[in-house]
Each structure stands twice: as structure tokens, then as C-alpha cells.
Design a protein with these regions (language model features):
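Active-site beta-strand/loop architecture of penicillin-binding DD-peptidases
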Residues: 1-4, 10, 16-115
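Short, highly charged C-terminal tails/helix-capping segments
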Residues: 117-121
Length: 121
């Protein structure tokens, strides 16, 4: 496989191990993503804050206008050792970017496996 730009193997291992823990550690921000997966995956969650709750005096998230709700992000790749898919999901003023990614990766890997099995037959 051709490498587009050089990456220090130690740096790559540090980053990919940290991204695995986002999904596999009980303290990971995407722990629910990794439940019942049949593949290894690494990911990173992110939030872009659109408002300061105190500044606008909102008492609950439900009272915040949609245009001021946070943007949610999730980047991931799978399988970890030999990735065949990498993606970034951005949900404007919403949630569940990691849930969307899970559906996409599940389906992609299911189709990829089916195609591989057909080629082998």
C-alpha cells in the first residue's frame, strides 16, 4: 500500500490506541458505539459549541433554539489493523454523529464481506 505522507509509527500507534479507547474504554465518549460490533474500530467524538448556556440564560437544553444547539462530530476508521473505511460525520445542531457512523460502517463492512465471499467462491 502506498503511503501518501510519512507517519511516525510510534505517533500512529499512540493516536490509534487513544481512538480505540474512545470506543472500548468504560470512560470513552463513544462507548456505546463498540457494543456488539464484529470488527475493530477507532473513533473520536467532537462537539462544536454554538452558544454559552450561561450567557444566554438558558436553563435547559430543550429551551435552546435549534440554530444555537451544538454541532456533533465523529471521525472513525475500521478495521483497525487494515482499514477499509474511514469517515467523518458532522451533525449540525443535533446529536448522534457516532450512531450514524455506526450504521454506515456496519453496512459497508457487511457489503465488503459479502463481495469478498463472492469473489472467493
Amino acid at each position: 500500500r502506498q503511503q501518501i505522507f510519512p507517519v511516525d509509527p510510534d505517533a500512529w500507534n499512540t493516536v490509534s490506541n487513544a481512538m480505540q479507547k474512545v470506543i472500548s474504554s468504560p470512560l470513552g465518549t463513544a462507548i456505546h458505539f463498540g457494543k456488539n460490533t464484529h470488527y475493530t474500530v477507532a473513533g473520536k467524538t467532537g462537539t462544536v459549541q454554538m452558544y454559552a448556556k450561561r450567557r444566554f440564560h438558558y436553563r435547559s437544553s430543550k429551551s435552546i433554539p435549534k440554530a444555537l444547539k451544538n454541532n456533533h462530530l465523529f471521525i472513525s476508521f475500521a478495521p483497525i489493523k487494515h482499514p477499509t473505511i474511514a469517515l467523518a460525520i458532522v451533525v449540525e445542531h443535533g446529536e448522534d454523529a457516532d450512531g450514524i457512523a455506526r450504521h454506515i460502517i456496519d453496512r459497508y463492512l457487511q457489503l465488503h464481506q459479502s463481495n469478498s465471499e463472492r469473489k472467493a467462491a
